[in-house]
Amino acid sequence: MPIWVDADACPLPVKEILYRAAHRAQVVTTLVANQGLRVPPSPYIKTQQVEKGFDVADHVIAQQVIPGDLVITGDIPLASWVIDAGGEALNPRGEIYTRETIQARLGMRNFMEELRSAGVQTGGPAPFNAADKQRFANALDKWLLKGKLS
């Protein structure tokens, strides 16, 4: 039950939670990014640097994920691929993507993309805050506990 992290856009507080959790739960956690990353020394924390390019890290993660893996990503298409592969997806704000919710999220993402393409300014997500950090930590702990019980 390894953890994969779409690390290019992952907030630092989320990475720090993941580092502690990887060590505490002894779960291999691989951060995939198109740039070098500094991570604490640990046999459970790995990095994988990929070529620069649109969605390159997403494709690398999607090709390696297997059922039971957890992927940390805010990228809706990647989350959909992960779910289709039998993995689980959690965004950095603590929202767990499920087979039931991912289609609606994809539809909304595509709709917003169409608006932006038409020149409509849609704004962005709210700044990452302490409540997001806590929701993420709680969701990660729940996933780790579920893994230990199975």
Curated annotation (Swiss-Prot):
Coiled-coil stretches noted in the UniProt entry, renumbered to this chain: none
Superkingdom classification of source: Bacteria
Pfam families: DUF188 (PF02639)
Family designation: Belongs to the UPF0178 family.
NCBIfam families registered for this protein in UniProt: PRK00124.1 (NF001095)
The protein, known as: UPF0178 protein ASA_3749
